[in-house]
Amino acid sequence: MRFVRIAAAASGATVFMWAGFAGAASAASAVRLVPHRAIYDLTLDRADEKSGISGLTGRMVYEFNGSACEGYTTNFRFVTRVDMDEQPQRVTDQQTTTFEDADGKDFRFVNKTFVDKELVKEVRGDAKLEDGKTVVKLSKPKENTLDLKGTQFPTRHMEELIGKAEAGQKFYQTTLFDASEDADRVVATTVVVGKQQAVPDDETKVMGKFSKDQVWPVTIAYFDDKEQQDGMPIYRINFKLYRNGITRDLTMDYGDFSMRGKLVKLDIYDTGKNKTGCSK
């Protein structure tokens, strides 16, 4: 899956993120991501006093579909109920739909954020990799065109990760455009991959035919010079990764608080009908 960060601050603001460009295509070519729908229960892991957060629960639903022939579609929903000190409970609902073409050159996105059922933000547009640049054309919240540095999109980012993990690479750095926040920046990522292993726990019961498969423990840190000038990541996520792209046992760390995501339901989609005539 791709990765999301969403922080509900006291002001009600939300921050959204979807978790070596030249080498990405070759590393990703042998990776096969399985279409699926995964549901995660969210709970508060820890909260520093300065965060103002006294409680957090929620649910994350992630749907991934498509193939290396037709491209990849994702539908994502991330709902959190956050209790703040001396403030009423706030419900934030992040809804995202994206399409990434099979070549990893085009990326379309629609991000909507609701706070207490009220639409407070919508970002809509598309991005293309052209002449070593990432050209972003926004239609909402207002029309705008941005020329950013060349990078990769979320599905290719995940394929690269799995390819490097299978090759035994434990540490690398790369970049990503994921249409986070205002869809106006490329973020840097630092990836650490642990030793592949079997980790039986409550979540493996949900994995069905993949329950005995081994996983890689992975940590990804995201950096953005526009927000952090001290070299510290703006967000960090830990998770267990299967070679087919499914993830579980998530810990999402925002600095002054973190939350856990436990996989509670997994549906694997039958794509046999969609692969007729597809040799990839």
From Swiss-Prot:
Complex formation: Monomer.
Residues making up the signal peptide according to the UniProt record: 1-24
Localization of this protein: Periplasm
Observed phenotype of the null mutant: Sensitive to the cell envelope stressors ampicillin, deoxycholate, and ethylenediaminetetraacetic acid (EDTA). Decreases virulence in a mouse model of infection.
Keyword terms, alphabetized: Disulfide bond, Periplasm, Signal
Superkingdom field: Bacteria
GO biological process assignments: cell envelope organization
Keyword Signal: yes
Intrachain S-S bonds: C69-C278
GO CC terms of this entry: periplasmic space
Principal subcellular localization: periplasm
InterPro entries: EipB-like
Classification via Pfam families: EipB_like (PF08904)
Organism: Brucella abortus (strain 2308)
Keyword Disulfide bond in record: yes
Protein's recorded name: Cell envelope integrity protein EipB
Role: Functions in the periplasm to maintain cell envelope integrity.
